Swiss-Prot record:
Entry protein name: Small ribosomal subunit protein uS5
Entry keyword Lipoprotein: no
Organism expressing this protein natively: Salinispora arenicola (strain CNS-205)
Entry note about domains: The N-terminal domain interacts with the head of the 30S subunit; the C-terminal domain interacts with the body and contacts protein S4. The interaction surface between S4 and S5 is involved in control of translational fidelity.
Lineage of producing organism: Bacteria, Bacillati, Actinomycetota, Actinomycetes, Micromonosporales
A Pfam cross-reference name: Ribosomal_S5
Residue ranges, compositional bias (Gly residues): 1-15
Length: 204
């Protein structure tokens, strides 16, 4: 009997060890791909498709991806599982990266963006102000590397509309050099002195 107990105990221990090994080699310690980008999941929704046999459920994910240094993109993923939907959203966002003109950690000038029923107003702010914005707008701005800005949502409260309106606003921004080139004037004539001083301070 004692021998059987030892064998049983040994067997249980080995099996437990195998379980632990499987657990250690499973998802918990699986190598995770590190990315230099910031990722924010703004919204996850469950959607249903009615088919002959009933309803098929899937998930959609609205994802913001940026490098925190002036580049940002928005993606929308759909899959049967939430992680897969998020992964698709991330890949979609990376395909739609665009550059955002900045002055320090703020924006060059006030701008308003519209998309569907979403309307978002952005205004530059002094250093140390922070991001004064709601969740969807904040996610886009932080991923773009904008940390001092005032914002207000003037339209729909739908996160998708707000995000796309914010993107439209950011795409409407122009750097002082772009404005000066378009008008055929020197930068000093189109940019406020405070803006030029702020840029010089950041550069130094």
């Amino acid at each position: 009997m004692p021998g059987q107990q030892r064998r049983g105990g040994g067997s249980g221990g080995n099996e437990g060890g195998r379980r632990d090994n499987r657990r250690e080699g499973g998802r918990g310690n699986a190598p995770v791909e590190k990315t230099p980008h910031l990722e924010r999941v703004v919204a996850i929704n469950r959607v249903a498709k009615v088919v002959k046999g009933g309803r098929r459920f899937s998930f959609t994910a609205l994802v913001i991806v940026g490098d925190g240094d002036g580049t940002v993109g928005v993606g929308y993923g759909k899959a049967k599982e939430v992680p897969a939907a998020i992964a698709k959203g991330v890949e979609e966002a990376k395909k739609h990266f665009f550059k955002v003109p900045r002055i320090g950690q703020s924006i060059p000038h006030p701008v308003q963006g519209e998309d569907a029923a979403g309307v978002v107003l952005l205004k530059p702010a002094s250093a140390g102000t922070g991001v004064i914005a709601g969740g969807p707008v904040r996610a886009v701005l932080e991923c773009a590397g904008i940390h001092d800005v005032l914002s207000k949502s003037l339209g729909s409260s739908n996160p998708i509309n707000i995000v796309h309106a914010t993107v439209a606003a950011l795409k409407g921004l122009e750097s002082p050099e772009a404005v000066a080139s378009r008008r055929g004037l020197p930068v000093e004539d189109v940019a406020p002195a405070a803006m030029l001083a702020s840029r010089a301070e950041v550069a130094s």
